UniProtKB/Swiss-Prot annotation:
GO terms for molecular function: histone binding; histone chaperone activity; nucleosome binding. It comes from Debaryomyces hansenii (strain ATCC 36239 / CBS 767 / BCRC 21394 / JCM 1990 / NBRC 0083 / IGC 2968). It is found in: Nucleus; Chromosome. Component of the FACT complex, a general chromatin factor that acts to reorganize nucleosomes. The FACT complex is involved in multiple processes that require DNA as a template such as mRNA elongation, DNA replication and DNA repair. During transcription elongation the FACT complex acts as a histone chaperone that both destabilizes and restores nucleosomal structure. The keyword Hydrolase does not apply. Residues 953-1033 are annotated as: Disordered. Residues 103-128, 467-517 form a coiled coil. The gene is SPT16. Residues 957-994, 1006-1018 have a biased composition (Acidic residues). One of its GO terms (cellular component) is FACT complex. Keywords: Chromosome, Coiled coil, DNA damage, DNA repair, DNA replication, Nucleus, Transcription, Transcription regulation. This is FACT complex subunit SPT16.
């Protein structure tokens, strides 16, 4: 028990529920005494042990718990007591006090402890108010023997408190419900595994007993191979990121029955008789996760008769009636059973005598709560939050058309796990129950039609299945079982509707959760408007004092001072400096013998949408005067060309520096790597890094040190890359199966510099094959004599890939282990992947436990699932072959992520995956303008959620976008504020200088002058207005 950690808050919360119920019945029981002896493997559901697990999360053998209305006392060994010490501190003032009375190896000291307990019990109890205990629970062991010896003559009075404990534990909190949900999912997957195994046995006519098949299913959860190799095992392991295989156990051994002998009691067992592949096969199984139970049972048919099918259809109808009208908050348990019985009497009275004696029970840590069974005697009410195993069945039915006398008798069962709610209950075990999913046909005759209850003809097999049957009959190698197992095929409309209904219910809750989270995260104070916009004014200064001006300006020519980033212009016989940040753009043209150079400068309101610019060159003020443009002319054409080019180059360099400064703003300098020495350093040789520090592709060594990783080039010792564990956000290993490289990938919290590149992703890889080209001829052919088909070469490549995977995965796990829990290894699930276009080309995007990734082709895609606010599906409409996926992040300042052109046939798979990882989904027929949407959300997030939040995404696109019905995605990003395009094009921008110098020369000067500068008449009019204004003042 070295890793035992007891949740103190959960313990005190649950203890208070017991004490509250104890207070309400204080006229019956005064206190509780619950003693546990040695562990009993034959009966794991003793209520006293269940109570320990519920309160503490663990079973404490040889331990007693004494509970009164205001305190709780533990009597246990000194070794176990140390795990309980944190319970003695009260989390709140109203919490009960907790005392720990240790037991010793000395029996005499223990007697003194028990005598002290007996004195407490005598004070609290009397014959009218006895001590509560669980009468059915009988334990053995030294602890129990010592207690019995001391208490035998004490004259204590006891009564059963099973009902009190049941009422305390019946309502499941969010943590308990999450565990039950995982257990139910596990049972559903294992039922699918059973169906696959059973189909193979029946189809291939193997001789297997019911008990042998039960053991085979039971052993699966203990097999690592099953989790990693089989489709069902992978499905269970990958569908839930919080799933831990070590916490899964069986509630009971799977019950498999066939051959005419059936028992619908929960205590039934699989017989040792052979599995009979005819008539009816019953399968019941239940898994528990973190001790919380689930239950599911199904009836499988092999060539059923019409009467059998009719009875089963009625069983489905009965379950639907019970769940839709009876199984809800406030209903008395006996009314559930009586309502089911009344429905049978009204619809099929001949089945009343075959109906089970109860129709389910309350479940939790205890598989079957005997104090809450859905029968005719139980007067307790269903409550919101209870977990119910609803079991409906008919036993001892007769099949008159059975050719085998042993198969004349059959039974039907249908069990599912539900959570009670105020409306219809929530189905947790979603294994298909439709007859088309559980019936298999072996006979070659064409399916006949039978009359359904409403009088219409009802075919036993759908047209799709009939066509499939004809195709299978033509191919003797194919299985005779007609149930389709293809990924994208739905063989039963009713089951598909049920699955869609479940997904919609889950999505509805996820959307509601996001809405509540949004209202909780933001307030009215988070709203921003235009008045909150505070532009940053660039601070620059060419020269502090006049003496710093270069001496060569005395010639009164135009000079460019590269050192001080300044243009010096001769104005009125004096050199006037202009910092390069004040320069906006310019133009040059020739007229006659003169060359004109026009320079435009930044000034407030000189064009462009100011609200879109984070930095401005000047602050507008009535005390400031601004020079908007100046024109100079010279007869020296070459001089003017050189000056203009020098000014342009200086501007480009200035803009480039500003951009680099902004890009480096989030680069955080890492702490120093603590190096290990000698053999303590774990290494992975012959790996390459992306991005490369140098232009040449050079291999190196990846090393694990005390607090991080170091990549060291094998040629240049000064070329190394350090990555600290504390800066690794995600660590991935990607196999080279079906790929050309094997990868260990680090996605970082803060970017680092590799060479001159800033990067959030660092990747270490090795090529899986050294075959650069196919040598089908030449000298090497003689070395492959006899292997012209390259079979041996392919086998060798597969072997090499397997070794690479093993080596890299082991090293990745070593990285995770060395990080002391800071880094957790994540592996992509290729079978859940889907193709799409996140950037420029179509790639395979693969989910992992925590992310959605694409690591093969740069730029890499790493989307953290926990950071996603909502996923929106665009262009989802009939007739299109593709759709788009948009991720909106909880941080609304982050840009949305688009994955375009996903094949439409993967739509359901993408929806299922997003639902499984608890991401709300919306969909629409059009592409949305996300820049405008996010600007609206950022401006007032509280009002956005107050107005309904993301609910608007479930509607169709705006009318202005309805003309976008192209099948292909839009890859061009539209301007979020198109109204200022004309102003921008006329006024120009500093962004013009961010391109290469080769793309801008003097040839475009004339057109620039026409677009950028104002004509002389306009300037004179403005000057006159300004003079008039100043004169009037």
């Amino acid at each position: 028990m070295s890793e035992v950690k007891i949740d103190s808050n959960s313990f005190h919360k649950r203890l208070s529920l017991i004490q509250k119920n104890l207070t309400s019945i204080q006229d019956k029981q005064s206190c509780l005494l619950l003693l546990v002896g040695a562990s009993d493997d034959e009966n794991t559901y003793k209520k006293t042990t269940v109570l320990q697990t519920w309160l503490l999360g663990y079973e404490f053998v040889h331990t007693g718990i004494y509970i009164t209305q205001d305190k709780c006392v533990f009597i246990t060994s000194e070794g176990k007591a140390k795990y309980l010490t944190n319970l003695t501190s009260k989390p709140t003032e109203n919490s009960s006090s907790v005392e720990i009375w240790p037991r010793y190896k000395d029996a005499e000291k223990n007697k003194e402890t028990f005598k002290k307990l007996i004195e407490e019990l005598k004070k609290m109890s009397s014959r009218e108010k006895p001590i509560g205990h669980i009468a059915k629970d009988q334990y053995r062991g030294k602890f129990i023997d010592e207690w019995n010896e001391v208490s035998a003559d004490a004259g204590l009075s006891f009564s059963d408190c099973a009902l009190l404990l049941s009422e305390s534990m019946e309502i499941k909190d969010s943590e308990e419900f999450a565990n039950t949900k995982i257990a139910s999912k596990s049972s559903t997957v294992l039922m699918d595994a059973f169906a696959n195994e059973m189909m193979v046995v029946v189809d291939e006519e193997k001789k297997t007993s019911n008990s042998d098949l039960s053991e085979k299913i039971e052993d699966k959860i203990d097999s690592n191979k099953w989790y990693t190799k089989s489709a069902t095992g992978k499905k269970l392991l990958q569908s839930m990121k919080e799933f831990d295989p070590s916490l899964v156990d069986w509630c009971y051994s799977p019950i498999i029955q066939s051959g005419g002998e059936y028992d619908l009691k929960p205590s039934a067992q699989s017989t040792t008789k052979a599995l009979v592949g005819d008539g009816v096969i019953l399968a019941s199984l239940g898994l528990r996760y973190k001790s919380y139970c689930s239950n599911v049972a199904r009836t499988f048919f092999i060539d059923p008769t019409p009467a059998m099918e009719t009875n089963y259809d009625f069983l489905l109808k009965l379950q639907n009636h019970v769940t839709s009208t009876l199984l809800r908050d406030g209903t008395v348990a006996s009314q559930v059973y009586q309502g089911a019985l009344d429905f049978i009497k009204s619809e099929k009275p001949d089945l009343v005598q075959h109906f089970t004696k109860n129709c389910g029970w309350l479940m939790g840590i205890e598989f079957r709560d005997s104090t809450f069974v859905l029968n005719s005697k139980n007067e307790r009410k269903l409550q919101n939050g209870q977990i119910i195993s609803l079991t409906l069945g008919f036993s001892n039915l007769t099949n008159d058309k059975a050719s085998n006398p042993k198969l004349k008798q059959y039974s039907l069962i249908l069990t599912d796990t539900f959570k009670v709610s105020e409306s219809e209950p929530i189905l947790l075990t979603t294994y298909p129950k439709a007859r088309s999913e559980t019936s298999f046909y072996f006979k070659d005759d064409e399916p006949t039609a039978v009359k359904s209850e409403n009088g219409g003809d009802k075919k036993l097999k759908s047209e799709k299945n009939i066509k499939t049957e004809k195709n299978l009959a033509a191919n003797e190698a194919n299985s005779k079982i007609l149930k389709s197992k293809l990924r994208h095929e739905s063989s039963a409309a009713d089951d598909s509707n049920n699955t869609e209904k479940i997904r919609q219910e889950i999505q509805s809750k996820l959307h509601e959760k996001r809405q509540h989270e949004g209202l909780a995260r933001f307030s009215k104070a988070d709203a921003t408007d235009a008045s909150d916009f505070k532009p940053v004014f660039k601070k620059y200064e060419s020269y502090v004092r006049e003496s710093q001006i270069p001496s060569n300006v005395r010639d009164l020519k135009i000079h460019v001072d590269y050192k001080n980033q300044t243009i010096i212009l001769p104005i009125c016989g004096r050199p006037v400096p202009f910092h390069i940040n004040s320069f906006k753009n310019g133009s040059q043209n020739e007229e006659g013998d003169f060359t004109y150079l026009r320079l435009n400068f930044n000034s407030p309101g000189a064009g462009g949408n100011v609200s879109r610019r984070a930095e401005l060159p000047y602050e507008d003020s009535p005390e400031n005067s601004f020079l908007r443009s100046v024109t100079l002319r010279s007869r020296d054409h070459q001089r003017m060309v050189d000056v203009y080019k020098a000014i342009q180059d200086l501007k480009k360099d200035a803009v480039k520096r500003e951009q680099e400064k902004k890009q480096m703003a989030d680069v955080v300098s890492q702490a120093n790597l603590v190096e290990l020495k000698g053999s303590r350093v774990k290494k992975l040789d012959q790996v390459f890094i992306r991005p490369q520090p140098d232009t040449k592709k050079i291999g190196g060594v990846l090393q694990i040190h005390e607090n991080g990783l170091r990549y060291q080039s094998s040629i240049r010792m000064d070329q190394k890359v350090d990555i600290l564990f504390s800066n690794i956000k995600h660590l991935f290993f990607q196999s080279c199966k079906d790929e050309l490289i094997v990868i260990i990938h680090c996605h970082l919290k803060n970017p680092i510099m590799i060479g001159k590149k800033k990067t959030h992703d660092v990747q270490f890889y090795r090529e899986a094959s050294d075959m650069a080209f196919d040598e089908t001829g030449g000298r090497k052919r003689r070395y492959r004599y006899g292997d012209e088909d390259e079979l041996q070469q392919e086998q060798e490549e597969r072997r090499r890939k397997a070794l690479l995977d093993k080596e890299f995965k082991a090293f990745a796990e070593l990285i995770s282990d060395s990080s002391s829990g800071m880094v957790d290894l994540d592996i992509p699930f290729r079978e859940l992947g889907f193709s799409g276009v996140p950037f420029r080309s179509s790639v395979l995007c693969m989910p992992t436990r925590d992310c959605l990734i694409q690591l093969i082709d740069p730029p890499y895609l790493v989307v953290t699932l926990e950071e996603i606010e909502i996923a929106h599906l665009e262009r989802v409409q009939f007739g299109l072959k593709n759709f788009d996926l948009v991720f909106v992040f909880k941080d609304f300042n982050k840009s949305v992520v688009h994955i375009n052109t996903i094949p439409m046939e993967l739509l359901e798979d993408v929806k299922s995956w997003l639902t499984d990882v608890d991401i709300p989904i919306s969909e629409g027929q059009m592409n949305l303008n996300w820049a405008t949407i996010m600007k609206t959300v950022q401006s007032d997030p509280y009002q956005f959620f107050a107005d309904g939040g993301w609910s608007f995404l479930t509607g169709e696109g705006d009318s202005e976008e309805e003309d976008e019905e192209d099948e292909e995605s839009e890859f061009e990003v539209s301007d979020p504020d198109p109204s200022d395009e004309d102003v921008e094009s006329e006024a120009g921008s500093e962004d013009d200088y961010s391109s290469d110098a080769s793309g801008s020369d003097a040839s475009g000067g004339e057109s620039e002058e026409e677009e950028e500068g104002e004509d002389w008449d306009e300037m004179e009019r403005k000057a006159a207005r300004e003079d008039k204004r100043l004169g009037a003042s």
